[in-house]
Design a protein with these regions (language model features):
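C-terminal motif of bacterial Sec signal peptides marking the signal peptidase cleavage site
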Residues: 15-18
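Bacterial lipoprotein signal-peptidase II cleavage site
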Residues: 20-28
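N-terminal pre-domain segments of enzymes
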Residues: 27-59
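Acidic Gly/Asp/Thr-rich repetitive segments characteristic of extracellular carbohydrate-active
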Residues: 63-87
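The right-handed parallel beta-helix/beta-solenoid scaffold, focusing on the short coil/turn
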Residues: 84, 95, 103, 111-113, ...
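Right-handed parallel beta-helix
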Residues: 117-119, 155-169, 192-206, 223-247, ...
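Short glycine/acidic-rich loop motifs that flank beta-strands on beta-rich extracellular proteins
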Residues: 125-129, 169-176, 204-212, 245-254, ...
Length: 371
């Protein structure tokens, strides 16, 4: 392994209407209406301002002109390429947009890209393509302006909110090349990422890989100067990954979430039925972190007021795999519940479903860690 107000979704029913990039009807593999609403119902932690939804009252681009057929995959891809704030006008009913190509962020189109589905839009990869891609070090997406090289430049802040991602597929993408492996729904290298009031169902990446992961999301490090502390954390707020049998996300590692060199704040979130399907652990082809896979050095994982349930890893950490290689990182679980995450081939003693290497034992605060 490598060394403001939050609007809660209740009774969300996303489905029925669907359209592809051609504007004609299409049927997604997963019906989002089958899924639970966004967020852990018993999660009531206060969300800091940095983790709250963004204002989208003055959008840069509105995808659609009032009908489901006008909300095409091509229109969404073009909106992402243009940057700014994106909203949707797809008519009164929930709509699923099935993509035939990945929407890619360009690093020279502003410092923030916000995608707001208005609690009615689902983005689908159709089981064939990744949904959303950002990388500060992919020259095809233009290196970000400003000081430093692509690794140290802050890049774009990507925000997705009030939206559902289904059937994203990042299988077969080479590790280390342009387009980056892992992250069936979202792959983000560099920059920063915030996810608020979102749902992720049946997103996948490769079944085998040592560090490769993130069936739903893969985030790779935005580097900072030596001694400057960890990079800006990923925010995952009031969101659902899986949530019921048949809707979980999967990959070699980190069935739902995966990262290298990245810190996370996860609040009021449900992660269940996700699977790390690899085998052989880091010396082989993965299988670590059924729900969450965190690898790196000076990294921090904070899980607050959340539920991790019925996730599975073939090797270590069916709920959480957290490894700080130089033992400077830390993990804290607060006001949360983990249960039904079966033991793989290894885990940390007295922490069912966890494998932790950090500067100190995992900090468990007012939480239940159950088998």
């Amino acid at each position: 392994m490598r060394t403001g107000v939050v609007f809660f979704l209740t009774g969300l029913s996303l489905a029925v209407a669907a359209c592809g990039s051609s504007g004609g009807p299409a049927t997604p593999k997963t019906n989002p209406q089958d899924g639970p609403p966004a967020g852990y119902p018993d999660g009531h932690a206060t969300v800091p301002a940095a983790g709250q939804a963004e204002d989208v009252s003055s959008p840069t681009t509105v995808v659609g002109t009032g009908t489901a057929a006008s909300c095409t995959g091509d229109a969404f891809v073009a909106a992402v390429a243009a940057g700014g704030v994106i909203t949707f006008d797809c008519g009164p009913d929930p709509t699923t947009i099935v993509l035939t190509q990945t929407a890619k962020v360009f690093n020279d189109k502003g410092t923030k890209l916000v995608i707001d589905g208005g609690n009615k839009v689902t983005l689908s990869g159709g089981g064939k393509v990744r949904i959303l891609y950002m990388a500060t070090c992919d020259q095809a997406q233009v290196y970000p302006p400003g000081p430093g090289d692509c690794n140290t430049n802050p890049g774009v802040q990507l925000v997705v909110q009030n939206i559902t991602f289904v059937d994203g597929n990042a299988k077969g993408i080479p590790e280390g090349g342009n387009n980056g492996a892992g992250g069936g729904a979202i792959h983000a290298q560099g920059g920063s990422l915030k996810v608020v009031n979102a749902r992720f169902f049946n997103n996948v990446c490769d079944d085998l890989g040592s560090d490769l992961g993130g069936g739903a999301i893969r985030k790779l490090d935005y580097l900072v100067a030596a001694g400057a502390g960890p990079a800006r954390p990923v925010w995952i707020v009031n969101s659902t990954f899986g949530g019921k049998p048949g809707l979980g996300n999967s990959c070699a590692n980190g069935g739902a979430l995966s990262s290298i060199g990245v810190s996370w704040n996860i609040i009021n979130t449900l992660l269940s039925e996700n699977t790390a399907v690899g085998h052989g652990a880091n010396s082989g082809n993965g299988g670590n972190g059924g729900a969450i896979y965190n690898d790196g050095n000076e990294i921090v994982l904070n899980v607050t007021s959340s539920l991790l349930e019925n996730n599975k890893a073939n090797e270590g950490g069916s709920a959480i795999f957290f490894v700080s290689n130089n033992k400077t990182g830390s993990i804290t679980i607060t006001d949360s519940l983990t249960r039904g995450n079966p033991r793989g081939t290894f885990e940390t003693p007295d922490l069912p479903g966890f494998y932790v290497i950090a500067k100190q034992p995992a900090q468990i605060v007012n939480s239940q860690i159950m088998r």
